UniProtKB/Swiss-Prot annotation:
Disulfide feature: none
GO molecular function, one term: pyridoxal phosphate binding
Protein name per its UniProtKB record: Alanine racemase
Enzyme Commission designation: 5.1.1.1
Active-site residues annotated for this sequence: 35, 255
Native source species: Marinomonas sp. (strain MWYL1)
PROSITE patterns given in the database record: ALANINE_RACEMASE (PS00395)
Record gene name: alr
PANTHER family in the record: ALANINE RACEMASE, ALANINE RACEMASE, CATABOLIC-RELATED
Modified residues (N6-(pyridoxal phosphate)lysine): 35
Keyword list, A-Z: Isomerase, Pyridoxal phosphate
Protein family membership: Belongs to the alanine racemase family.
Pathway membership, UniProt: Amino-acid biosynthesis; D-alanine biosynthesis; D-alanine from L-alanine: step 1/1
Length: 365
């Protein structure tokens, strides 16, 4: 017998979300961003399912990329953070990786390595101030990369700070800065669009888009679910009721006795906790479903368990009943909101303890 906690991942939903991203920006090629274990969905399984259709994959670092190559992935793979040590350029050449480049040290190390790289994505700091060169320096970097004889093509890339906030003018300012840099360089392919940008902003035609969170059916925008904006949520996290007990009015539950029964009712204990990735800071009232009926968190989240109550106390929970923690009509975005965080964090913090089950177009495994 196994602990009844399962993350069911709909791979076909991820593929359809990728196709939707390309439909929204039809002149662009698209990465499938599978960093951080495909946002907690399983990078190898997701990439294997998408490999025959995607234009390329994108990950954060070289160890993620090597793991995909070792799993048989043949599509191009971009390192979004570039290399961290000069020796990694040789590995990029060996495995055919593309890489971001954002500073003089990386450029010097590339030139010293003599490695041949098909595509280098030069990171422009258009205002986020994490990584990248400025618009005055960008033409110098592009010339150096082209003159090195080591790089097949240079792409100019940037990242937007506030694309998920349609009322914020920062994105327009960053786009203008990017275009100024691009014009000073001359003809060069562009990559500017993350999920929020793909869905709501105009981007340069013919470049590369980088759908990330939207691939997994999760909204990049606050206060709306992925399903409500045309995405297909890919993950359902489910478990079972493993114990029930009758509470009397005034009984207190859990660590810190953080839940007090306002009336007599049946309490259910469910096999999931923060040791699995369920958010410890989820508050009383966080939604879930038991046997298809609305229920909510009642008491502090433990490492391995939570305690819950039915919304309608006449619906008494029973041992072995199915529990949906998020997915379906329990949006992960809503659960995240109750925990004071975002859907990105919930899925990427999934641990190795849940059993993963993958649904494909023609069946399941």
């Amino acid at each position: 017998m196994a602990r009844p906690l399962t993350a069911t991942v709909d791979l076909e939903a991820i593929l359809q979300n990728y196709r939707y991203a390309k439909k929204l920006q039809p002149t662009c090629k698209a990465f499938a961003v599978v960093k951080s274990n495909a946002y907690g969905h399983g990078a190898v399984e997701v990439s294997r399912y998408l490999d025959k259709e995607v234009d390329a994959f994108a990950v954060a670092a070289i160890e993620e990329a090597i793991a995909l190559r070792e799993a048989g992935i043949v599509s191009p793979i971009l390192l979004l953070e570039g290399v961290f040590e000069g020796e990694e350029w040789a590995l990029c050449e060996k495995h055919g990786f593309w890489s971001a480049l954002e500073n003089a040290q990386q450029l010097d190390e590339l030139q010293a390595s003599h490695a041949k790289i098909e595509k280098v994505f030069l990171k422009l700091d258009s205002g986020m101030h994490r990584l990248g060169v400025d618009k005055e320096t960008a033409p110098v970097f592009v010339s150096a990369l082209k003159d090195s004889g080591q790089v097949g093509e240079v792409v100019l890339m940037t990242h937007f700070s506030c694309a998920d906030d349609l009322s914020d003018l920062t994105t327009m300012q960053q786009l203008a800065y990017f275009e100024q840099a691009r014009q000073s360089i001359g003809e060069i392919e562009a990559s500017v669009a993350n999920s929020a940008t793909i869905m709501k902003w105009s981007v340069p035609e013919g470049g590369w888009i980088r759908p990330g969170i939207m691939l997994y059916g999760i909204s990049p925008f606050a206060e709306v679910s992925g399903r409500s904006i045309g995405l297909r949520p890919a993950m359902t996290l489910s478990s079972k009721v493993i114990s029930t007990r009758k509470l009397k009015q005034g009984d207190k539950v859990g660590y810190g006795l953080g839940y007090v029964a306002a009336e007599d009712h049946v309490l259910a204990t469910v096999a999931v906790g923060y040791g699995d990735g369920y958010p410890r800071h989820a508050v009383n009232g966080t939604p879930l479903k038991i046997d298809g009926k609305p229920a909510s968190l009642a008491g502090r989240v433990s490492m391995d368990m939570i305690t819950v109550r039915m919304q309608d106390l006449a619906d008494e929970p029973a041992m072995g009943q199915d529990v949906v923690l998020w997915g379906g009509d329990v949006p992960v975005e809503e659960v995240a909101d109750y925990a004071g965080t975002i859907g990105y964090e919930l899925v990427t913090r999934m641990t190795s303890r849940p059993h993963y089950r993958y649904i494909r177009g023609e069946g399941s495994q």
